[in-house]
């Protein structure tokens, strides 16, 4: 295994700076930008470029064949949602190495699904989990351990063990939210088996802080930076990223849906899978897969019960 000190232009002092800044993992270093590395590790941008290039050579980041990509995708894991119908709709569960976005109106089930996944990721693979831990970045004070208890009991899991494997970060503004996502790397380097990062909600702070057209460009730039960090985590650690999103009214919509997801093209392009949640009759929820690289659009119905998400 190649260590940081083995790279050209990296002495003991620089290596320590890189580790302190969260770049102790070679793949994390190889996928960084020179500007990002320069700012966070407090090294010159020229040095940062050389270090990144050396890390890319060490990780053999280059062109690969489609067969290589197919072989690598065999490592992709999936986390059950608790609903067989919803799992089938999205190809077997929430996928690692990808960002999955769910959007919908208040009460459509976004936070409920977030709580469910924080538990099911801990299940063994034969039960639809990854035998791993979760990070829950809570931007709207929606996380409730009492809800985790109900779901854990339904799966007959030890409550204390389940709670200890969910790492909560209460984010109070967009800058704090971005910082907490960046600190996920530190948790993993400390030995935590993080395979799921939940952000509930992704856009709430950005929407509240950057108001009006004059702030739109700055908001989208910061949101793009945040999504880049999340995608890096997904790729580097074979983790799943699950984000919830709000919707807003479309007063000019004479046909189709009267609402649309917040985040614009930046989020639309960054999310690998996009799922629209809607309220149905008799307490049911409707999930519609609206975007996927390889799956067709489709719908399914599930329920939210005391035990969690069920068919």
UniProtKB/Swiss-Prot annotation:
Gene Ontology terms, MF aspect: ATP binding; ATP hydrolysis activity; ATP-dependent DNA damage sensor activity; damaged DNA binding
Keywords: ATP-binding, DNA damage, DNA recombination, DNA-binding, Nucleotide-binding
NCBIfam families, alphabetized: PRK04301.1 (NF003301), recomb_radA (TIGR02236)
Classification via HAMAP family: RadA_arch
Family from the record: Belongs to the eukaryotic RecA-like protein family.
PANTHER family reported in the protein's UniProt record: MEIOTIC RECOMBINATION PROTEIN DMC1_LIM15 HOMOLOG, RECA/RAD51/RADA DNA STRAND-PAIRING FAMILY MEMBER
Stated name of the protein: DNA repair and recombination protein RadA
Organism: Methanothermobacter thermautotrophicus (strain ATCC 29096 / DSM 1053 / JCM 10044 / NBRC 100330 / Delta H) (Methanobacterium thermoautotrophicum)
Protein's gene: radA
């Amino acid at each position: 295994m190649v260590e940081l000190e083995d790279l050209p232009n990296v002495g003991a002092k620089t290596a320590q700076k890189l580790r302190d800044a969260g770049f102790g993992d070679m793949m994390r270093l190889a996928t960084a930008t020179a500007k990002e590395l320069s700012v966070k590790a407090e090294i010159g941008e020229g040095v940062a470029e050389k270090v990144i290039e050396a890390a890319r050579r060490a990780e053999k980041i280059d062109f690969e064949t489609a067969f290589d990509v197919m072989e690598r995708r065999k490592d992709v894991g999936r986390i059950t949602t608790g609903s067989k119908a919803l799992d089938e709709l999205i190809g077997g569960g929430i996928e690692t190495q990808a960002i999955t976005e769910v959007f919908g109106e208040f009460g459509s089930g976004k936070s409920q699904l977030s709580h469910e996944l924080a538990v099911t990721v801990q299940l063994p693979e034969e039960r639809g989990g990854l035998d791993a831990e979760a990070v829950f970045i809570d931007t709207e004070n929606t996380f409730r351990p009492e809800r985790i208890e109900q779901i854990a009991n339904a799966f007959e899991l030890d409550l204390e063990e389940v709670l200890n494997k969910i790492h909560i970060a209460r984010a109070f503004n967009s800058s704090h939210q971005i910082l907490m996502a960046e600190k996920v790397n530190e948790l993993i380097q400390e030995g935590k088996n993080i395979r799921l990062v939940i952000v509930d909600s992704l856009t709430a702070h950005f929407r509240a802080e950057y108001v009006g057209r004059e702030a739109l460009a700055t908001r989208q730039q910061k949101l793009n930076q945040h999504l880049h960090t999340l995608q890096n985590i997904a790729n580097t650690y074979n983790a799943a990223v699950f984000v919830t999103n709000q919707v807003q009214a479309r007063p000019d919509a004479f046909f189709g849906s009267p609402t649309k997801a917040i985040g614009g093209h930046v989020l639309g392009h960054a999310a690998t899978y996009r799922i629209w949640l809607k309220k149905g009759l008799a307490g049911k929820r409707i999930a519609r897969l609206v975007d996927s690289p390889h799956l067709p659009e489709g719908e399914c119905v599930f329920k939210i019960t005391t035990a969690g998400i069920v068919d």
